[in-house]
Amino acid sequence: MNCYLILTVALLLTSAMTGTTTAGQLNKKGVTLREDDRFPCNPGGCACRPLDSYSYTCQSPSSSTANCEGNECVSEADW
């Protein structure tokens, strides 16, 4: 039983020491990113985080932002 405890503690410490997270990084607009800070859309597009999702969708800057969090579609320049 002590082996399981030691293994669990070792895994937790390894995770804490590497500083890996699944979320929590912020870009300059304060948008929480899922995995890394790369812009998720093609050049000329913008990233919309739908109100009912944690994943970004790409759309044209001229598209409606009514379903985007904060009513905003973030361009690559503002990412």
From Swiss-Prot:
Propeptide feature: residues: 24-37
Domain of life where this protein originates:
Eukaryota
Q: Which GO terms describe its cellular component?
A: extracellular region
Disulfide pairs?
C41-C58, C46-C68, C48-C73
UniProt keywords (A-Z) are: Disulfide bond, Neurotoxin, Secreted, Signal, Toxin
What one GO molecular function would you report for this record? toxin activity
Annotated signal sequence range: 1-23
The record's tissue-specificity note reads:
Expressed by the venom duct.
Copy the domain comment.
The cysteine framework is IX (C-C-C-C-C-C).
- Entry protein name: Conotoxin Cl9.4
Q: Which organism is it from?
A: Californiconus californicus
